[in-house]
């Protein structure tokens, strides 16, 4: 069913996002009502991607539960991890470890970029957001928040273990070297959006060298933070290399983070009182992710570099997992370009990637499409420039991809 040529599903999702942006005191209710209305609409009228009726709904839920469970585990886990990190007092020392001008903020974005090559981009973004919150005395410019998300997404775009979309391509038969090309665009984009965002942040709230007298870094809590991060990185890399199918069947990364927190709790207990608030915020975010997963995307234009460029903009609004699955089934892409587009493109709007959705739990003010676009305009510019540099340096060279797993690519990788 259409309204002025637009599927009603999209209209309902747009109304939900409009409600979230305008009814600030009832965002959870708006998100839940939106998710319920879209679900009921597809249940009664259009059916789901996995079929019609209740069986289609159950099939879709079965397909998405790993995504949602991973996100829930990471959101709750990193709320506790952030508290460990804050109580370690390392953020009080960071102003003396980083340059105290705009280059300090830029270096933090580089760190997030590098982390995301090995770590889930949600985790990398939340770590970056936690550090930024302490480093800038909780006064973080929305343009810089957007840059943290962009750095986490760009950092994973060239690694087959750094992003679900690239993992899907790898499982389907793409060479890791094909995907690695995305780092050319990613690094160019980072230089552009990173420097602009860091300068904006420095003008808004500079890094201040003002250690609290007598404070020292609590090594035990910092060690716990490192252990939790290593657990997340370790299981992500190990399963990607040895048993990638498991990642699509069980929320491995979210579970690893929560288990690491429980194992270390007897050594230093986290602030468990944070969980109710974190859970409420997580339900809001999961409702939006569920809505995005329901958006109908049935086919793509012919594979070409303009199509790949356009997919980056599309992925800022719609889930990049089904977009990637469609591209794999379609075949005929230069997979480095596609990895860059669908991996980095979602950074242009706050709900365009799981990293953006997750970081809004730290910075609720980021949940505004207009504020994100206005303050983070440099991300869209950087995306296009990075893509064009790739095109000029590498040229467009489509590779045939092994179709052995393309029939079910989205079911063999964790959601991002």
Predicted segments, located by residue:
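Interfacial loop-to-helix junctions that mark the boundaries of transmembrane helices
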Residues: 1-5, 22-27, 51-71, 99, ...
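Helix-loop-helix module between adjacent transmembrane segments
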Residues: 78-83, 111-123, 150-159, 185-194, ...
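Long, contiguous bundles of hydrophobic transmembrane helices that form the permeation core
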Residues: 190-261, 403
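Membrane-interfacial loop-to-helix junctions in multi-pass transporters
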Residues: 5-10, 67-71, 97-110, 136-146, ...
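Hydrophobic transmembrane alpha-helices that form the pore/transport pathway of multi-pass ion
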Residues: 104-157, 168-172, 325-340, 365, ...
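Hydrophobic mid-bilayer segments of alpha-helices in multi-pass membrane transport proteins
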Residues: 7-17, 24-51, 68-80, 221-231, ...
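Transmembrane helical segments that form the transport core of multi-pass membrane transport proteins
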Residues: 228-333, 410-415
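Juxtamembrane and boundary regions of transmembrane helices in multi-pass small-molecule transporters
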Residues: 2, 87-90, 138-142, 146, ...
């Amino acid at each position: 069913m259409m309204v002025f040529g637009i599927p009603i599903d999209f209209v309902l999702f747009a109304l939900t996002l409009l409600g979230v942006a305008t009814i600030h005191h009832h965002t959870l209710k708006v998100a839940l009502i939106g998710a319920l209305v879209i679900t009921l609409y597809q249940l009664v009228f259009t059916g789901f991607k996995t079929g019609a009726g209740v069986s289609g709904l159950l099939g879709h839920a079965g397909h998405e539960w790993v995504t949602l469970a991973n996100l829930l585990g990471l959101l709750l886990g990193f709320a506790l991890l952030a508290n460990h990190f804050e109580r370690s007092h390392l953020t009080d020392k960071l102003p003396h470890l980083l340059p105290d001008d705009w280059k300090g903020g830029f270096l933090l974005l580089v760190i997030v970029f590098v982390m995301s090559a090995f770590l889930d981009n949600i985790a990398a973004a939340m770590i970056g957001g936690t550090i930024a919150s302490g480093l800038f005395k909780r006064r973080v410019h929305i343009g810089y928040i957007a840059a943290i998300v962009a750095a986490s997404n760009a950092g994973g775009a060239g690694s087959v273990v750094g992003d679900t979309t690239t993992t899907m391509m790898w499982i389907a038969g793409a060479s890791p070297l094909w995907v690695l090309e995305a780092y050319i665009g990613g690094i160019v984009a980072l230089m552009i959006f990173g420097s602009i965002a860091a300068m904006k942040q420095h003008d808004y709230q500079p890094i201040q060298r003002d250690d609290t007298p007598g404070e020292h870094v609590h090594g035990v809590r910092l060690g716990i933070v490192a252990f939790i991060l290593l657990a997340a990185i370790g299981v992500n890399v190990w399963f990607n290399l040895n048993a990638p199918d498991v990642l699509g069947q069980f929320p491995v990364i979210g579970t690893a983070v929560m288990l690491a927190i429980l194992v270390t709790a007897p050594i230093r207990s986290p602030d468990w009182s944070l969980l109710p608030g974190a859970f409420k915020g997580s339900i809001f975010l999961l409702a939006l992710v569920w809505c995005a997963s329901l958006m109908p995307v049935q086919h793509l234009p012919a594979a070409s570099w303009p199509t790949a460029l356009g997919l980056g903009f599309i992925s800022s609004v719609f889930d990049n997992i089904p977009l990637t699955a469609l591209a794999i089934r379609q075949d005929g892409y230069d997979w480095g370009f596609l990895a860059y587009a669908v991996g980095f493109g979602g950074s242009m709007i706050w709900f365009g990637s799981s990293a953006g959705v997750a970081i809004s739990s730290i910075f609720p003010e980021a949940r505004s499409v207009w504020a994100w676009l206005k303050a983070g305009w440099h991300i869209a510019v950087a995306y296009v420039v990075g893509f064009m540099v790739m095109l000029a340096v590498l040229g467009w060279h489509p590779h045939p991809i092994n179709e052995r797993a393309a029939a079910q690519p989205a079911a063999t990788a964790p959601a991002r």
